[in-house]
């Protein structure tokens, strides 16, 4: 079954909605050099993660300028996982992971060499549509065929992000066959505010999409 992360949560009401919908992970955004209504202060992220139920994985999405910056964030906010935007070397990610926090770097779908280099030292790889600054969260899809090729080539779980919505997530899963999917703007009523009906619809579609893959393969066979 495809795992689901809902990202860019900013308050307890949306956190509860994500949990009630059956998502596997929730993300909050801190310390990013881009203008986004989803960014919240470290203290707020810490409060939200402390309020998360025990089986909902908390993910801090950030773009730190150094490994020390990332360590400080992990120590101060206390997430289960750090999702890192930026050009970090494999050795740096390995040392960060050794502190006990999960590490998920963001990689361009066309950069197979980097994905292969990082795969042995990270918990998963997230493929997103990058902005000019190198951050994700553009709300735009990318070449899913390239993402599918990356899934096949990399020995690590791959999480698909970028422009996903309740309307296209089944097709995305059927095409890419990722370990998980990640959504932010695709389930929002407005910037930084989740549409709870859309959250429920997205999670349900993503969770049943793997059956759609299996059914499709049987028809083709």
From Swiss-Prot:
InterPro entries linked to this entry: Aldolase_TIM, PRAI_dom, RibuloseP-bd_barrel, TrpF_fam
GO biological process, one term: L-tryptophan biosynthetic process
Intrachain disulfide bonds: none
EC number assigned by the record: 5.3.1.24
Keyword field: Amino-acid biosynthesis, Aromatic amino acid biosynthesis, Isomerase, Tryptophan biosynthesis
Keyword Isomerase assigned: yes
Position of the signal peptide: none
Pathway: Amino-acid biosynthesis; L-tryptophan biosynthesis; L-tryptophan from chorismate: step 3/5
Swiss-Prot/TrEMBL catalytic activity: N-(5-phospho-beta-D-ribosyl)anthranilate = 1-(2-carboxyphenylamino)-1-deoxy-D-ribulose 5-phosphate
Domain of life: Archaea
Keyword Amino-acid biosynthesis: yes
GO molecular function annotation: phosphoribosylanthranilate isomerase activity
HAMAP family: PRAI
Family named by the database record: Belongs to the TrpF family.
PANTHER family: N-(5'-PHOSPHORIBOSYL)ANTHRANILATE ISOMERASE
Protein name, per record: N-(5'-phosphoribosyl)anthranilate isomerase
Organism, as annotated: Haloferax volcanii (strain ATCC 29605 / DSM 3757 / JCM 8879 / NBRC 14742 / NCIMB 2012 / VKM B-1768 / DS2)
Gene it is expressed from: trpF
């Amino acid at each position: 079954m495809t795992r689901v992360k809902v990202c860019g949560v900013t308050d307890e009401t949306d956190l509860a909605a994500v949990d009630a919908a059956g998502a596997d992970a929730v993300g909050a955004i801190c310390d990013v050099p881009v203008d986004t209504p989803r960014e919240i202060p470290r203290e707020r992220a810490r409060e939200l993660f402390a309020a998360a139920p025990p089986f909902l994985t908390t993910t801090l999405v950030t773009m730190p300028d150094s490994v020390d910056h990332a360590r400080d964030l992990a120590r101060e906010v206390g997430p289960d996982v750090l999702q890192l935007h930026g050009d970090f070397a494999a050795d740096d990610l390995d040392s960060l992971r050794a502190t006990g926090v999960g590490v998920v770097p963001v990689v361009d779908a066309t950069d197979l060499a980097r994905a292969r280099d990082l795969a042995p030292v990270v918990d998963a790889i997230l493929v997103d549509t990058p902005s000019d600054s190198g951050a994700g969260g553009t709300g735009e899809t990318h070449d899913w065929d390239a993402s599918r090729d990356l899934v096949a080539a990399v020995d690590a779980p791959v999480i698909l992000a970028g422009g996903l919505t309740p309307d296209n997530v089944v097709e995305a899963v059927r095409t890419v066959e990722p370990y998980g999917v990640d959504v932010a703007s695709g389930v929002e009523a407005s910037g930084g505010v989740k549409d709870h009906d859309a959250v429920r619809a997205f999670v349900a579609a993503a969770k049943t999409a793997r059956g759609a893959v299996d059914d499709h393969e049987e028809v083709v066979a």
